[in-house]
C-alpha cells in the first residue's frame, strides 16, 4: 500500500474488493441438478434478495414530474394568489397537518381545492417542492417565512434546519431578534442558544439597536440572568439607563421594575452614590430610592450582610469562555483541501470558519500568542514552504508570515518558549531531519540542531521545557524511536522507544504524559495507543481507539483528549472520539463536516463573540 499522505498515493489497501474474486477457480449458477462437491447436500431454494437504493429517488422524481405536468393531481392548494397542484397521498405522507386534513372528517377531505391562510405563498411552494424532492435551500431571504410555514405544516425536519441556519447567523446585532423569533415559534433549542449567546456577548449586545428596542419583559429576562457576562454591575446599570433614555416618556414608568434586577449592592460605593444616587430619574421615583438605600445599607453595614442576602446580592457567574478545537486542511476524497472548521465541546457542534488561501494536506498546525499557524504541507501539486496565520477574533487568515527555509509536508509543529518549531517532514526530494524555529517578533526562521534521524509523518510534543519528536518514517519504514530536544543545549538525545512503529500518528500532552495514538506501521493503519511517562522514561499501552486512524489529529480540549479524523485503511474519516483516563475508554462523540486525513489540529480559547462563523448565506438540505 502507498503512503496515503504522499502525493500520487490513493491510500487504499487491497481491502475487501480483493477478496471478492472467488477462490475456487470454477463458476456455476447453483441451479439445477448438476454436479456436487464433496458429500451430497440437500437442494436449497433459489433466492435473491434485493433492496434498491435508486428506487426512492427515482420514484420521487417521477412523482414530481407528474405534479409538474398536473397529472393524477387530486388537490389544488390556494395560497395567497397562487394555485399549487399536488397529490393528497404525498402531502399526507410528509406532513401531519395534511394527513389530519385529508384523512379525517374535515370538510377539506372532500374538497378538490383547499384554501390555506396565514402562510406565505413562496414558503408554501418551497415546502411542497421539498415533499417531492427532499431538497430545499434555506437562506436569509426566506427563513423568516419558511420557519412559521414549516411549524404550521408540522414539517419538523425543516423547522430544525431553519433553526440551525439561524444559529449560524447569530451575532451581537441580531441575536435578540432571533431570540424573539425563536420564542414566537417555540423553537426551544434555538431560544436556548440565542439566550446563551446574548448572555455571553452582553457587552456588545447592549450597544445594538435591537437592545434599545426591547420590550420591558424581555429586558428583565436578560438582566435577571446569573450568567450575564459583564466586567462589573456598572455595565448592567448603564445598559438599563441607555434603554430607558431611548424613550423616556413611555419607559420611565418601568424604571423601578427594571432597576430591581440590577444588583445595586454589588456596585462600588463611589458609583452607587455618585452615579446611581444622583441620577434625576432614579431620585424622582420612590421605589428606586428604596433600592438605592438598600444597597447603601449593604455596603455600610458589613456585619448585617448575612441577614440581607437575596437575588440582588448574589454575584453573577458568567460561563467562562472554554477552549475550542480547529481542524485545518488535510486530504479529503482524493484531494488536498483548504477548509477549516471549529469544534465547541460545550455544544458538541462543528462550524465552518474562513478557509485558508491554499489547500494543504500534511500541514503542521500550532497556536502561538492566540493565533493559529498552518505551516507547509502539500496542495495536491506542490510541496509548500508558505505559512498562514489565523486570527479567531476577525475570522481571517493572513499570509504575511515568513516562509520556512525549506518546503515541508508531513511536518511536526509545536510551540516552545515563545518560538514556533517546524520538525522533519519531506521536501519532495528527501525525508528531512532539519529543524527550524520561528520568532514572531522578528518574523524570521532560524535553524537549530537537526534530529539524529530523518522523520516524515513525525509527531511532536512539548513537555517540561523539552521538544519531543516521536515516530514517523525515515523514508523507508515506520519508526518507533523517540528523541528529545533541549533548547538550552541545542541538542537532541534519544529516549526510550514506543512499543509500536508509527508514522502519521497523533500526539498530545495530557495529564503530564505524552500520548501517541494510531498511525500506520509496516502493514496497516493502527487503532492502538500508548503513553510516555517522562519521570520513568517508559511507554505503557492504553486501550485502543474505536477506529483505526492514520493521519489522525490529537488534541486536549477543556481537559479532554480528542482524536480527530484520519484514515482507517479503506475510508477517510470525519468521526472524532474522546478518551476518558478514569475508565480507560474511548467513545465516539460526533463528526466533522469534512473527512480529513493529515489535517492539523489546534486548540484556542473561544473568541469573545460568535460572529465569525464562515458559511454561505444559504443552507442546503439535500441528502444530508
Swiss-Prot record:
A Pfam family the protein falls into: BACK
Region annotation (Disordered) ranges: 1-55
Pathway as given in its UniProt record: Protein modification; protein ubiquitination
Cellular component GO terms held in the UniProt record: Cul3-RING ubiquitin ligase complex
Coiled coil start-end: none
GO MF annotations, alphabetized: actin binding; ubiquitin-like ligase-substrate adaptor activity
Segments annotated as Kelch repeats: 324-370, 372-418, 419-465, 467-512, 514-559, 560-606
This protein's UniProt keywords: Actin-binding, Kelch repeat, Repeat, Ubl conjugation pathway
Domain BACK residue range list: 175-277
Location of the BTB domain: 73-140
GO annotation terms (biological process): negative regulation of synaptic assembly at neuromuscular junction; proteasome-mediated ubiquitin-dependent protein catabolic process; protein ubiquitination
Protein function: Probable substrate-specific adapter of an E3 ubiquitin-protein ligase complex which mediates the ubiquitination and subsequent proteasomal degradation of target proteins. May have a role in synapse differentiation and growth.
Protein name in UniProt: Kelch-like protein diablo
Annotated organism of origin: Drosophila virilis (Fruit fly)
